[in-house]
């Protein structure tokens, strides 16, 4: 299987969400020795924020783009191509101030493209085009808000991924990362246990084993 990993923490190797991704990748290395992994780090290699030039480039037909618009659109095209090429997509996302990092929001803006990753039917209903993917959302959260109104990020991500056609999505959160060393260790251990309990069979989708 081809696995795409999107990292988004600004903390590099000290990132808790990256630790979860590393734990998953170690498991995949054993269970899928023939698989391939592509890693994109949005903090180390940031995706530019949307501006007027970006919108202009993406909404201009490819054959009509000037040289600068072609350069701008090339990155978005690469990000989208990675999505379609992958069988499994792993997003490692920390919670910053109750929401996702700015660099991850910028990534979403680049991959949410009408006529490319989603379209509208004749009846005006949206249809996601990034289909048939296993998606694992690995979240690191300073507090403990899973399943409460304070967790504003998870509902948004569920809606956005479904809008793009990604419906086989499993969320695993390491909570309590900013509540002391013991709480952080317990939160990471529980999240790792949930990762270990996953069935990663491509034919069955992500599910608890």
Curated annotation (Swiss-Prot):
Role, per record: Quinone reductase that provides resistance to thiol-specific stress caused by electrophilic quinones.
Quaternary structure note: Homodimer.
Assigned EC number: 1.6.5.-, 1.7.1.17
Enzyme class: oxidoreductase
Record keywords, A-Z: Flavoprotein, FMN, NAD, Oxidoreductase
Cofactor binding: number and manner: Binds 1 FMN per subunit.
Classification via PANTHER family: FMN-DEPENDENT NADH-AZOREDUCTASE 1 (PTHR43741), FMN-DEPENDENT NADH:QUINONE OXIDOREDUCTASE (PTHR43741:SF2)
Species per Swiss-Prot/TrEMBL record: Bordetella parapertussis (strain 12822 / ATCC BAA-587 / NCTC 13253)
Family statement drawn from the similarity comment of this UniProt entry: Belongs to the azoreductase type 1 family.
Name of the featured protein: FMN-dependent NADH:quinone oxidoreductase
UniProt-recorded Gene Ontology molecular function terms: electron transfer activity; FMN binding; oxidoreductase activity, acting on NAD(P)H as acceptor; oxidoreductase activity, acting on NAD(P)H, quinone or similar compound as acceptor
Cofactor: FMN
Binding-site positions, FMN: 9, 15-17
Catalytic reaction(s) noted: 2 a quinone + NADH + H(+) = 2 a 1,4-benzosemiquinone + NAD(+); N,N-dimethyl-1,4-phenylenediamine + anthranilate + 2 NAD(+) = 2-(4-dimethylaminophenyl)diazenylbenzoate + 2 NADH + 2 H(+)
InterPro entries, per the entry: Flavodoxin_fold, Flavoprotein-like_sf, FMN-dep_NADH:Q_OxRdtase_AzoR1, NADH:quinone_OxRdtase_FMN_depd
């Amino acid at each position: 299987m081809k696995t795409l990993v999107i990292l988004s923490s600004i903390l590099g190797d000290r990132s808790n969400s990256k630790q979860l991704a590393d734990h998953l990748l170690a498991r995949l290395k054993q269970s899928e020795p023939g698989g391939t992994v592509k890693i994109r780090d949005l903090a180390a290699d940031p995706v530019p924020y949307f501006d007027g030039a970006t919108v202009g480039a993406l909404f201009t037909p490819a054959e009509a783009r000037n040289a600068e618009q072609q350069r701008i659109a090339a990155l978005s095209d690469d990000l989208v191509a990675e999505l379609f090429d992958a069988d499994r997509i792993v997003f490692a996302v920390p919670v910053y101030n109750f929401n996702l990092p700015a660099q991850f929001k910028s990534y979403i803006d680049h991959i949410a493209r009408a006529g490319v990753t989603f379209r509208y039917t004749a009846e005006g209903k949206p249809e996601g085009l990034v289909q048939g993917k296993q998606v694992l959302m690995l979240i690191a959260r300073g507090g403990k808000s899973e399943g409460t109104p304070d967790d504003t990020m998870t509902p948004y991500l569920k809606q956005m991924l479904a809008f793009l056609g990604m419906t086989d999505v499993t969320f695993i959160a390491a909570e309590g990362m900013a509540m002391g060393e013991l709480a952080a260790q317990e939160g990471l251990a529980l999240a790792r246990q949930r990762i270990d309990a996953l069935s990663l069979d491509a034919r069955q989708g992500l599910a608890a084993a």
